[in-house]
């Protein structure tokens, strides 16, 4: 008998699979039950009557430092470079045969594999994007951004008027300054909406216009201050991206301030020449720790312990792998990066998942395509 899908509400579900969201209904219901099941109460022990005795000597109460902390939870990555290499080779061959069209489906295969090999609390994440969505988003990005900017440049060059050519360049720069934040927000919204854990999807609720104002204003201030505003600008972007993200109906929270990174940033600027630029690995590690340690989900808080030395070793190892193999080690580099990120990241504190429910959402892949087109790719963390 036909039924309704418990995840997307689509009617006409026959059997155990939804034809619209492709979820396995029995597994979805089981995961929800697992999340909402209250802890099993312990049996209360009864005390038999005992003979009266002298009261025991008072014992010292445990100090606050002896109180056990909430367990630290970790993400785990179970993928392998060999398996991802097989996916990569097939993607290359199919992309060549289809004159580049298959690359959208290839990108989906890589994302799906990476997320399916990422586990939290014993359950894997899932990716629900499709190649058709990415292709459609790419075509929209070409129509919305690529063609107008190209036409603007050609008009300025063919006019033969220096004033018109300069005006065309200014308008092109203004268009890029608007489309980059549009692409960043669109990519964030699309990718989070296509990522789920235990059948519950992530989402993003930031308004594009708010981020355009933040991005344009921050870019201008960074230029006017000769780059010294940059750590504040980066922190403001991170705050926007994190604070408008949700898991189910519950939001993430970011409490960082850009001025906290200013001292480390200025020190890195001063040490750039003496250290041949290597000091920026330590600044990057400091920024990663700061961003994660000021990110919260409910009462739980993220912790990061990455160091500049470990980040430098990872980068050198990745570069050597790519150079020695002429780029064929790219899948192993992705796996190394994922394992590295999760090895230094924990989530500490009380985490109540029982009341989380799925929110209705809809997101286009146009922003995801624009981010790739403009090189403004954005990810969590």
Q: Which ranges hold each PLM region?
A:
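Cys/His-rich metal-coordination motifs, chiefly Zn-binding "fingers/knuckles"
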Residues: 1-45
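Long, low-complexity intrinsically disordered regions
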Residues: 33-65
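Membrane-interface extramembranous regions at the lipid-water interface
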Residues: 54-90, 105-139, 186-215, 233-266, ...
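Hydrophobic, aromatic-rich membrane-embedded alpha-helical segments
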Residues: 88-109, 215-235, 266-284, 319-336
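Hydrophobic, ordered structural segments
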Residues: 129-135, 141-243, 277, 331
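Membrane-proximal intracellular helices of multi-pass ion channels
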Residues: 137, 318, 323, 361-381
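Membrane-helix interface segments in multi-pass membrane proteins
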Residues: 148-176, 284, 333-361, 374-381
